[in-house]
Amino acid sequence: MLYFLSVGRGGIQVNIFVYTKSKCPNCVVAKQLLKSKGLKFIENDMDTESVRQAFHFAYPDVKQLPQIFINDQRVGGLAGLQQALKDLGL
């Protein structure tokens, strides 16, 4: 998969959105992984009705959480995140 990155002061900048739900062990691991790499991300809580409805409208076939998007590209769940970070050299 190709990730479009912008290079700014201080190196590579990525926009990361993580869709999570409480009591989701893989969500916790994904967030810990991003934090351990020093990457900032925006968390979208699927326990919130409006977030859940908007997500399922855009991605009706996706049932697994977490769901991670890097620079507007869906990388999938935890395994997808791990592969994306490896591909990016992070």
Name each model-derived stretch.
Residues 42:
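Conserved beta-strand positions in the Rossmann-like core of class I SAM-dependent methyltransferases
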Residues 12-39:
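Local sequence-structure signature of Cys/Sec-based thiol-disulfide redox active-site neighborhoods
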Residues 70-90:
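Non-catalytic, surface beta->alpha helical segment in thiol-disulfide oxidoreductase systems
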Residues 45-62:
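Thioredoxin-like thiol-disulfide oxidoreductase module
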Residues 1-13:
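Short, Lys/Arg-enriched N-terminal segments with co-localized hydrophobic residues
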Residues 25, 50, 76:
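Short alpha-helical
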Residues 59-68, 78-79:
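Structural micro-motif
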Residues 28, 53, 83:
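Alpha-helical elements of the RecA-like P-loop NTPase motor core of helicases
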